[in-house]
Swiss-Prot record:
Gene: MPV17
Name of the protein this chain belongs to: Mitochondrial inner membrane protein Mpv17
Annotated family: Belongs to the peroxisomal membrane protein PXMP2/4 family.
Effect listed in the UniProt record for changing residue 66 to E: In MTDPS6; uncertain significance
Source organism phylogeny: Eukaryota, Metazoa, Chordata, Craniata, Vertebrata
Keyword tags: Charcot-Marie-Tooth disease, Disease variant, Membrane, Mitochondrion, Mitochondrion inner membrane, Neurodegeneration, Neuropathy, Primary mitochondrial disease, Transmembrane, Transmembrane helix
């Protein structure tokens, strides 16, 4: 409970920094889960550079992009009624999610040294499955998020749920 209060104080004092660092930390945690529980690499075979890449992506891409998107979405559709939440979720999942995944997957590929041709082939192979899997999880989460959660907590709530999603994304993005 004290940790949560400290997080709230830090979030109130430095909202953008805390949101970005939260995204980076939880992206890293998702990669650790992917490597250790899904891929069963063990500590000796753990790819620390890959985890650092995911932390960097969380801080430099996911946190700023998703956090910025929530601000834009809240300005575009102000309000917290059920109808407002539904509109936000539909825009988020119909517009933002496909674009986000279409940027995230090749960004990871580029950071992993894939050639443009290999990256394009990987995107064509992985994108449809990643988007379909996205739709199994995120519409319900986002509907609740937009209806129940204040704007300054949305990225943190999503990133907590996203630990599992990040594990999947890390596995998908690093699978050759």
């Amino acid at each position: 409970m004290a940790l949560w209060r400290a997080y709230q104080r830090a979030l109130a004092a430095h909202p953008w920094k805390v949101q970005v660092l939260t995204a980076g930390s939880l992206m890293g945690l998702g990669d650790i889960i992917s490597q250790q529980l899904v891929e069963r690499r063990g500590l000796q075979e753990h790819q620390r550079g890959r985890t650092l890449t995911m932390v960097s992506l969380g801080c430099g891409f996911v946190g700023p992009v998703v956090g910025g998107w929530y601000k834009v979405l809240d300005r575009f559709i102000p309000g917290t009624t059920k109808v407002d939440a539904l509109k936000k979720m539909l825009l988020d999942q119909g517009g933002f999610a496909p674009c986000f995944l279409g940027c995230f997957l090749p960004l990871v590929g580029a950071l992993n040294g894939l050639s443009a041709q290999d990256n394009w082939a990987k995107l064509q192979r992985d994108y449809p499955d990643a988007l379909i899997t996205n739709y199994y999880l995120w519409p319900a989460v986002q509907l609740a998020n937009f209806y129940l959660v204040p704007l300054h907590y949305r990225l943190a709530v999503v990133q907590c749920v996203a630990v599992i999603w990040n594990s999947y994304l890390s596995w998908k993005a690093h699978r050759l």
